[in-house]
């Protein structure tokens, strides 16, 4: 396997991959591990496959959910829920995700394809999902530069209030984090363990 350095696009898509699968910020340590895997030669879709094979994903995210409920859950990570998107748009995505699962594709590959699509020039009907994904990615990026948290509930809470109502810039993302008690640039102290 050839070694390479993760570029800015890889880094952005890594945040989005974690968001799509876990609806969470990665945190500093998890992000470093993911980028190290890319530096060792893994593609982002391979990283997605590795993430969807983790105990956290298989037990804490999808657990015992039916296929239909798994689809609904992953759709919610992109804001594709009632009140935030139209029924036709949700049906289109639901059918797409379900068909991909039935053909044997992994959640890692499906989410990778979804984030790549939303990061490009998506159909205008998915503009709000793209804005939400970008806003979450910016918040996750700023958060993960300062915080080493690895607890899934905490990492999900970081993004819980992010919306697609406005397009976030750096200042808006920092204000959001300040509002949830996670100011940008904070130094997080950790307790040493013997």
Positions of the model-derived regions?
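Substrate/cofactor-recognition hotspot
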Residues: 2-194
């Amino acid at each position: 396997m050839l070694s390479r350095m993760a570029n800015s696009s890889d880094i952005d898509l890594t945040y989005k991959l974690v968001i799509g699968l876990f609806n969470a910020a990665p945190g500093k340590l998890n992000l470093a591990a993911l980028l190290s895997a890319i530096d060792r030669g893994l593609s982002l879709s391979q990283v997605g496959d590795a993430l969807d094979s983790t105990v956290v994903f298989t037990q804490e995210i999808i657990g015992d959910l039916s296929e239909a409920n798994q689809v609904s859950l992953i759709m919610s990570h992109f804001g594709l829920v009632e009140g935030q998107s139209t029924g036709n748009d949700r049906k289109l995505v639901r059918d797409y995700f379900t068909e991909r699962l039935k053909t044997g594709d992994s959640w890692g590959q499906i989410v990778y394809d979804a984030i790549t699509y939303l990061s490009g020039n998506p159909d205008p009907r998915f503009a709000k999902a793209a804005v939400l994904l970008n806003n979450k990615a910016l918040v996750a990026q700023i958060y993960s530069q300062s915080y080493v948290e690895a607890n899934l509930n905490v990492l999900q809470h970081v993004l819980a209030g992010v919306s697609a109502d406005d397009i976030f810039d750096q200042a808006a993302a920092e204000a959001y984090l300040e509002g949830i008690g996670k100011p940008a640039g904070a130094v997080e102290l950790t307790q040493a363990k013997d």
